Amino acid sequence: MIKKFITSQLLTDKEWNHYIQNLQSAPAANNDAEECDCAAMLRPLILKGMDEEMQEVDTIVNNPEAPTFANTIVALANTGENLERATAVMYNLLSAETDDNLEELASELAPKLSEHSNNIMLNEKLFARVKAVYDAETNKLEGEDKMLLDKTYEGFERSGATLSDEDKQRFREITAQLSEKTLKFSQNVLKETNNFVLHITDENDLAGIPEIHRNAAHHEAEARQLEGWVFTLHAPSFMPFMMYAENREYREKIYRAYNSRCTHNNEYNNFEIVRSIVNLRREVAQILGYKDYADYALRRRMAQNAKNVYQLLNDLIDHYLDHAKQDVAEVEKKAKQIEGADFKLQPWDFSYYSQKLKHELYDYDPDMLRPYFELSQVQKGVLGLATKLYGITFKRNDNLPVYQKDVIAYDVYDKDGAFLAILLVDFFPRESKKGGAWMTNYRDESCNAPPHVKVMPDNSNRPVVSVTTNFTKPTADTPALLTLGEVETFLHEFGHALHGIFAMTHYASLSGTSVYWDFVELPSQFMENY
């Protein structure tokens, strides 16, 4: 299963287009679990991809012709396609379906990939060609061409191309360390999350917890070959426990476990990693001439600088702070009504008594809505909404190999029946998957047509878009029933997915969600709040 999935995602654009055209007539994919050393598959391809990209860069640098937009900027944008595909698979699987070998590979390759990037971005001859085009063409080009030129030139500046030799060397050292430490940080969080279980054997300790969550905890215990019930730090288990469990001691225990991840005296402690990341980021920002890392990061955001961010936050405080204090006071009042005047509200109490107050004031319990949000029906509703709004259709494709048996693949078509994208949806938590929800691409869209020619689906390389969540799992007795919040999360990430699905650009580096990170939330907010 996963081996065939990886192989398919590593195809060249031409091979991929041929592959998906023939999928409908292919037999259904065998997506049962299989033994696969993904790291062993990917390692030689990534190393080879780095060598190939350097050869492509050398060709640009050694081009005897004067630098032009086509032979320098576009040529550079088209380098490293094989490397990009292989690293996309590696990093996406690190988040969605990781294992020890894959994490070891990522740790091994992080400094190598950082050095590879620096060897390109700090190449003086290459930057000279880029700057020559930028100086000559920046006020002449329009649209995507101008965006590609500006983004390329600024990318070199932000990667140290204008620094002194001494600062360039320090920049290399910093970025190598950052690549290792940021990766290690994420790996530690996942492992620490998976390490904790709250194992309950006395049913009295489940008081207050609705049957649906008890059943899920019982199935979790069975999967671990344990008696009783198991609650974890994954959201579908952790959040209901905090909201409903009457056992205050256990609420405190699981709350502290969740909020103290990677702070213990063990191999997963992130204190020094965080301190090092902060200091290294500050140093790299200052080397590049920025006041601090916030200003460096925000230069590529709509907000532009930290001053604008703080102004927005300070303006908002006047509108929400009094209301927030009032909400906390009301919850504390409710808690004292139940527990007595001497009761002191703690962080692990807030969700529990907040839910009690909501039930009293509004007769509202979020679990009351779950039967209306059965996952298969929600999928139909969300995809159907896209059909109604945008005219696109989704056809389930069981012939496409996926990386895990719960993943569902859809072919996406526009209103005229032209192929737009493949959408993968991966809904449920597992130990090999990080928490939260996100959208990503396994393959980016790009167009083979010449610039300024209208892009149509039949002359572009269509993307593979993935929506990954951690929704409540189904059990043998109960289908997957979502909360309203989970439905909103699905719509939010689906908005990001539509941004990728509708992509129609000439250059992959500008495709879909490759926009300012604050602007990228517009399609997701639109779908979430529609």
Segment roles from a protein language model:
Residues S164, N259, F428, T472, ...:
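Hydrophobic alpha-helix feature that most strongly marks membrane-spanning transmembrane helices
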Residues I60-P64, R396-N399, S524:
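Surface-exposed patches in mature extracellular/periplasmic domains of secreted proteins
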Residues E144, L148-L149, Q177-E180, Q187, ...:
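Active-site-proximal, well-structured secondary-structure segments within enzyme catalytic domains
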Residues H18-M41, V89-L109, K131-E173, T232-E272, ...:
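Short His/Asp/Glu-rich catalytic/ion-coordination signatures at enzyme active sites or charged loops
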Residues T162-K168, I392-D398, I501-L510:
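Inter-helical turn/loop segments and adjacent helix faces that build the functional surface
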Residues P479-T489, G500-F526:
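Post-HEXXH active-site segment of zinc metalloproteases
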Residues I2-I209:
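N-terminal helix-rich structural modules
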Residues R282-A285, G289, A386, L484-I501, ...:
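Active-site recognition of the HExxH zinc-binding catalytic motif
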